[in-house]
């Protein structure tokens, strides 16, 4: 069985990356896709579920996982830790499932260094004004936090150049389509096609 492909998706808070990934999973059943669930030390928000949105753990538990080298990557964001479990990623890929990682640029850099075959995607908002509007519309943060997120967004967006692909989330449906096309192209690479269709290719070339 051919291994699944690993896709890294990063974007500033409020850009819509989580909604894009979920829409991709719901509307494109051609490929088996799983969204990795990260571990975090931040407080659970209303409407979130442990094990679905994140694995919510204590600082002590997180540190124990670091000590045991159980994370593929981890980073501190807004005074909270976020990390990606090695075991979870390896299992998903081994079953032929494509795994999506919704992580920030720091985590993305760590994973690209460890797994250079991964595909990385950065998502930008159409403008700062639209990003601010989306953050306000969520109704989750105070004005002070929103201002902090906007400042952080500018810093994060400077790292788009480190990624393989860039999507502008101006038109949601078009952005979902662009995300799907990236998956399709990755599956058509020579390396992946040889893994998936090795027997077929050998039979065709057998004299």
Curated annotation (Swiss-Prot):
Keywords: ATP-binding, Cytoplasm, Kinase, Nucleotide-binding, Transferase. It is an enzyme of class 2 (transferase). ATP binds at residues 11-18. Its EC number is 2.7.4.8. Essential for recycling GMP and indirectly, cGMP. Belongs to the guanylate kinase family. This is Guanylate kinase. It comes from Buchnera aphidicola subsp. Baizongia pistaciae (strain Bp). The gene is gmk.
């Amino acid at each position: 069985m051919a291994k699944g492909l690993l896709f890294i998706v990063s974007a500033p808070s409020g850009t819509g990356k989580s909604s894009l990934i979920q829409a991709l999973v719901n509307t494109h059943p051609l490929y088996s896709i799983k969204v990795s669930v990260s571990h975090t030390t931040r407080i659970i928000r209303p409407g979130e579920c442990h094990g679905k949105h994140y694995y919510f753990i204590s600082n002590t538990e997180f540190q124990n996982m670091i000590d045991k080298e159980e994370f593929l990557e981890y980073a501190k964001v807004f005074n909270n830790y976020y990390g990606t479990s090695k075991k979870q990623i390896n299992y998903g890929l081994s079953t032929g499932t494509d795994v999506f990682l919704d992580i920030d640029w720091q985590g993305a850099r760590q994973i690209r260094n460890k797994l250079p075959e991964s595909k990385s995607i950065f998502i930008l908002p159409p403008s700062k004004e639209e990003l601010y509007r989306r953050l306000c519309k969520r109704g989750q943060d105070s004005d002070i936090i929103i201002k902090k997120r906007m400042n952080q967004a500018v810093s994060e967006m400077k790292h788009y150049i480190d990624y393989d692909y860039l999507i502008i989330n101006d038109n949601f449906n078009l952005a979902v389509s662009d995300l799907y096309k990236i998956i399709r192209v990755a599956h058509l690479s020579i390396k992946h096609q040889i893994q998936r269709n090795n027997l077929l290719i050998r039979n065709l070339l057998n004299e």
